[in-house]
């Protein structure tokens, strides 16, 4: 990776014991911007929330400040914003530690979830100061990089959700039991969002699990470091959530011995991660952004250690430096940033900048490596130039036309197998596109109650992902849709035939995976629901092809079988694989899955016509191009049929629908005319009213289920909050 904004620093002063040996320490050239962000959030907190120590003992240190050393390759124009976000997190975290009942976790979590869903946080005259601060920060970040700003908001919301569990005291039986909880409590999801935003990184969704696995030693090293240095101020708590305390209790040892054990674990995890970084950078089967992410996160480990050795947050006797004290006393308005963004090219439009490209294999050859014109790389001899391996036998036999060679080939039953590299390419392309991951969230939310083992949960997620992705590939062909998530649809790139082949291959893969689920009943459930998916889709296609408007009941039943089918399938599979399945009635979760399916589809219908963001992702009022009978269009047609005064609008709409059938699309001018007719019938308003009513019913259903299971489901409520219109 090219280093543009940082320089190597000798770490021996901060690490005389060599605990982080093998992981370099770097310093950002624009560290002054971190201080500005930190003092700005302190000033805002005092003004909008309440008193706070001055200077606040957060991310700053007299020699080493946190962001400057942990994100040394942050784009300079984003450094102040992520510094603000980090110390906002520290301020909120301290409030949770001292008075959790006043921390407004629900409000902050809901605000961030809303920001992650819509790109903005609604404010009102009665909004809390914390909500106003979060809204302002999100606005600043959206102006720089909307997609990654929303990703940050979602990640942060997940961290706030976890913080709510601190109300419950934990009695840890082992360090291995403590570590997973502490990994989340560390603010890892918040930090993940800040780093990916700051460095303009987007790890493809299909690499998320691998990202978490590769990163695990780094996260453990950081949590052990934090616990090692924070124990002094936490040791007098009734039940400190700290690795040193856990080790002392488990091993019945002294504090000094526990600290030594903690250090040895840090050394071990650092060595693991240094090896992972080296191995990851040598790989050719993962995206460039995952490589960058794993490399960049090593500086979180080294920077966190160096910062922890001298920061006032962990050391009561540590003093801030002179400039920090001046800014604390007089404000950043009087002592502004000394670093000038204008005097430095920021490189934001580079390979992975704000407008960068993060394709599966990059844009200029295998894994994004650029080749000089006419130059052949070592891999070119083994690939077709697009990262797909040539079959081995092509290299061995070449293209011989000698009769004996042809006969020998014809009689050879042991020719090397053809890999699945070609058939999965369209699928890999689709799954590399940005996704909100609602179905994974639904599975995780249900697991709050169902307690399905992690391995089985992952299998169910993969089954649903394969089916959903395959259905999108086929839907786009059937609907002749040119865009998917703001990018060209799969068939536009790979052609209809190859896309259909890839999609049906994924159906067979999903079936094979469903057959390997522990409970044999799961395969039957899977097959039943796949049949329903096809039946539901058949009616959608039938109505479109024949220009037949269904009734509302027919439409809802189609939705139950098509869109709701995947939600129902994942619900039934999770119940089938739950250890508590014997005590759960078959119908317990059916109303929830049906409501989510109907809400999701009607919401999609509404946004297709009313959302500017949806238009950017899929095209302007795309459902009208496809000739689909959406909920809104059905209401419009029914209203026109019932209102004699709208006879001319009825004729006009019918003419537009016939024109769409003949031309296979409508012009934007025609679409605007159709939308004007819908405004006269108030169909969009009606659809929005139905959505809000369904949202209320969903909330009631969650209340009912929480009562039945005896456990609140914050993650499910968060998911529903993200879906609000």
Curated annotation (Swiss-Prot):
It comes from the Eukaryota. Residues 373-382 have a biased composition (Basic and acidic residues). Mg(2+) 4 binds at residues 475, 479. Gene3D superfamilies: Farnesyl Diphosphate Synthase (1.10.600.10). GO terms for molecular function: lyase activity; metal ion binding; prenyltransferase activity. Residues 362-388 are annotated as: Disordered. Isopentenyl diphosphate binds at residues 436, 439, 468, 485. Mg(2+) 1 binds at residues 93, 97. Keywords: Isoprene biosynthesis, Lyase, Magnesium, Metal-binding, Multifunctional enzyme, Repeat, Transferase. Binds 4 Mg(2+) ions per subunit. Dimethylallyl diphosphate binds at residues 484, 562-563, 601, 608, 618, 628. GO terms for biological process: alcohol biosynthetic process; mycotoxin biosynthetic process; terpenoid biosynthetic process. Residues 1-322 are annotated as: (7Z)-ophiobola-7,19-dien-3-ol synthase. A motif (DDXXD 2) lies at residues 475-479. Substrate binds at residues 93, 182-185, 226, 230-234, 313-314. Mg(2+) 3 binds at residues 475, 479. Its cofactor is Mg(2+). Mg(2+) 2 binds at residues 93, 97. It catalyses: isopentenyl diphosphate + (2E,6E)-farnesyl diphosphate = (2E,6E,10E)-geranylgeranyl diphosphate + diphosphate; isopentenyl diphosphate + (2E,6E,10E)-geranylgeranyl diphosphate = (2E,6E,10E,14E)-geranylfarnesyl diphosphate + diphosphate; (2E,6E,10E,14E)-geranylfarnesyl diphosphate + H2O = ophiobolin F + diphosphate. A motif (DDXXD 1) lies at residues 93-97. The keyword Transferase applies. Pathway: Secondary metabolite biosynthesis; terpenoid biosynthesis. Bifunctional sesterterpene synthase that converts isopentenyl diphosphate (IPP) and dimethylallyl diphosphate (DMAPP) into ophiobolin F. The C-terminal prenyltransferase (PT) domain of AcldOS converts isopentenyl diphosphate and dimethylallyl diphosphate into geranylfarnesyl diphosphate (GFPP), whereas the N-terminal terpene cyclase (TC) domain catalyzes the cyclization of GFPP to ophiobolin F. The conserved DDXXD motifs as well as the NSE/DTE motif are important for the catalytic activity, presumably through binding to Mg(2+). This is Ophiobolin F synthase. It comes from Aspergillus calidoustus.
């Amino acid at each position: 990776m090219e280093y543009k904004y940082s320089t190597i620093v000798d770490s021996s002063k901060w690490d005389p014991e060599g605990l982080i040996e093998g992981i370099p320490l770097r310093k950002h050239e624009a560290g002054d911007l971190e201080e500005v962000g930190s003092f700005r959030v302190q000033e805002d907190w005092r003004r909008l929330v309440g008193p706070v120590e001055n200077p606040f003992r957060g991310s700053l240190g007299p020699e080493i400040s946190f962001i400057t050393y942990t994100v040394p390759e942050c784009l300079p124009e984003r450094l102040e914003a992520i510094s603000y976000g980090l110390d906002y997190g520290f301020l909120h975290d301290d409030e949770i530690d001292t008075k959790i009942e006043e921390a407004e976790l629900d409000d902050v979590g809901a605000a961030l979830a809303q920001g992650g869903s819509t790109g903005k946080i609604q404010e009102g005259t009665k909004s809390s100061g914390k909500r106003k601060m979060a809204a302002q920060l999100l606005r600043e970040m959206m102006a720089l990089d909307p997609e990654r700003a929303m990703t940050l908001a979602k990640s942060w919301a997940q961290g706030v959700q976890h913080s709510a569990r601190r109300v419950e005291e934990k009695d840890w039986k082992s360090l291995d039991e403590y570590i997973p909880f502490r990994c989340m409590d560390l603010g890892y999801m918040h930090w993940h969002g800040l780093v990916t935003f700051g460095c303009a990184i987007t790890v493809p969704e299909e690499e998320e699990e691998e990202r978490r696995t590769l990163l695990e030693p780094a996260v453990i090293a950081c949590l052990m470091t934090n616990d090692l240095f924070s124990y002094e101020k936490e040791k007098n708590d009734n039940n400190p959530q700290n690795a040193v305390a856990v080790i002392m209790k488990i091993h019945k040892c002294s504090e000094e011995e526990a600290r030594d054990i903690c250090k040895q674990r840090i050394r071990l995890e650092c060595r693991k991660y240094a090896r992972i970084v080296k191995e990851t950078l040598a790989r050719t089967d993962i995206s460039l952004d995952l490589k960058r992410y794993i490399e960049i996160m090593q500086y979180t480990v080294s920077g966190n250690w160096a910062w922890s050795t001298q920061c006032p947050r962990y050391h009561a006797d540590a003093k801030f430096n002179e400039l920090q004290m001046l800014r604390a006393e007089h404000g950043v308005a009087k002592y502004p940033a000394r670093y000038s963004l204008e005097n430095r090219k920021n490189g934001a439009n580079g390979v992975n900048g704000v407008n960068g490209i993060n394709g599966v294999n990059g844009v200029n050859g295998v894994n994004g490596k650029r080749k000089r014109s006419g130059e052949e790389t070592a891999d070119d001899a083994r690939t077709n130039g697009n990262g797909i391996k040539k079959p081995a036998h092509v290299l061995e036999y070449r293209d011989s036309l000698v009769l004996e060679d042809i006969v020998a080939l014809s009689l050879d039953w042991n020719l090397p197998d053809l890999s699945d590299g070609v058939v999965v390419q369209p699928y890999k392309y689709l799954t590399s596109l940005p996704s909100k991951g609602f179905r994974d969230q639904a599975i995780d939310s249900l697991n709050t109650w169902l307690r399905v083992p992690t391995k089985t949960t992952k299998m169910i997620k993969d089954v649903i992902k394969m089916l959903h992705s395959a259905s999108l590939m086929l839907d786009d062909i059937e609907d002749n849709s040119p865009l998917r998530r703001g990018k060209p649809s799969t068939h536009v790139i790979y052609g209809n035939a190859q896309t259909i082949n890839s999609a049906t291959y994924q159906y067979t893969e999903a079936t094979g995976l469903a057959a390997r689920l522990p409970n044999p009943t799961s395969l039957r459930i899977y097959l039943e629901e796949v049949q329903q998916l096809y039946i539901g889709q058949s009616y959608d296609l039938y109505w479109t092809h024949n220009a037949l408007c269904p009734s509302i009941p027919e439409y809802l039943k189609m939705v139950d079988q098509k869109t709701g089918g995947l939600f129902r399938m994942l619900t039934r599979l999770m119940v089938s694989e739950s250890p508590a399945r014997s005590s759960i009635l078959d119908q317990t979760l059916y109303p929830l899955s049906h409501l989510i399916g109907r809400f999701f589809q009607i919401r999609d219908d509404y946004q297709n016509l009313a959302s500017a963001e949806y238009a950017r992702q899929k095209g302007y009022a795309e459902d009208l191009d496809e000739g689909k009978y959406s909920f809104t269009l059905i209401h419009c047609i029914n209203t026109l049929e019932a209102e004699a005064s709208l006879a001319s609008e009825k004729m006009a709409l019918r003419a537009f629908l016939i024109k769409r059938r003949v031309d296979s699309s409508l012009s934007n001018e025609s679409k605007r005319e159709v939308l004007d007719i819908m405004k006269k019938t108030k169909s969009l308003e009606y659809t929005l009213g139905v959505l809000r009513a369904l949202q209320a019913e969903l909330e009631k259903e969650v209340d009912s289920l929480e009562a039945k299971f005896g456990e609140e489901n914050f993650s499910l409520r968060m998911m529903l909050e993200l879906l609000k219109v």
